[in-house]
Amino acid sequence: MYNKGDKRKTTLKQKEDNDMAEIKVLALDLDGTLTNDQKEITPRTRAVLDAAIDRGVTVVLASGRPTAGIMPLAKELGLDKKGGCILSYNGGKIIDCCTGEALVEKTLDPALVPELCAFAAAQDVAILTYNNEGVVCERDKDEWANKECFTTKLPMIHVDDLASYVNYPICKMLIALDPARRDTVCAAGKKQFAGRADLYPSSPFFIEAVPLGVAKDASLAALLDHMGLTRDNLMACGDGLNDRSMIAYVGVGVAMQNAEQPVKDAAVYVTTADNNHDGVAEAVEKFILREE
């Protein structure tokens, strides 16, 4: 359904069958958007994306997940052969699926790692990051931290002292916690790390800690510049608060029916179907394949 009450959204509806810019890039959030709650791409959504790719649309998988947690889905969609990109760590890294080349990579200031770990300890919540093998965390039995393993299909690796363990560049850290505490802890983190790192929610139980200025919209802007395209050529679908920036930025921003309200408010279109019922397929058929 169209999100009414915004002149830009009304204009898009009027232009839909006429002079709307050709969509050449499709950015898709994964969890709660492209995948269902079992973290799978449904057959219908896969078929619709295949049709879009065959029409020359470049698919970008844009997620807070680490690159290793996105690559299996990229290969499932054939992006390693047909072309496409991975935007991982909420935009901290952009990878060309065919070549493996990193087009963009931004890492956290190493000095912030022990402070972030201390902040999490003071809040009595789990904090994690990644290495080449999986998810790295002191609280390896934590219910909320293990949701990242379920999401990414990566193993949990226990370390005794995360701050000392991380002696390599990282693109982000992730705070995992009871949803009832998310907003309070996030507000405290924003205050403590203001001007040095960005903290924002990406799910009911995750708070991202990323380099200052890293967000999906900024990284997509860099990718579009690399491709010689404009945001009018870009469509994006998402559901979480970390998707709001890209939904507001792109030419056609789509929120899933299951999206958080601020994301719906930023979108030009809200799907009638949620992520468990092919919401992405609905949006792609409507705006790219133009099926009513």
Where are these regions (language model features)?
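Asp-based phosphoryl-transfer active-site loop
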Residues: 24-37
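Conserved acidic, metal-coordinating active-site core of Asp-based
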Residues: 119, 123-237, 241-245
